[in-house]
Amino acid sequence: MNEYLLPK
């Protein structure tokens, strides 16, 4: 999974 798809 890509980090930019995760909530900050």
UniProtKB/Swiss-Prot annotation:
This is Cytochrome P450-like protein. GO terms for cellular component: extracellular region. The lineage of its organism: Eukaryota, Viridiplantae, Streptophyta, Embryophyta, Tracheophyta. It is found in: Secreted, Cell wall. The keyword Secreted applies. Its main location: secreted. It comes from Cycas revoluta (Sago palm). Its cofactor is heme. It comes from the Eukaryota. The keyword Methyltransferase does not apply. Keywords: Cell wall, Secreted.
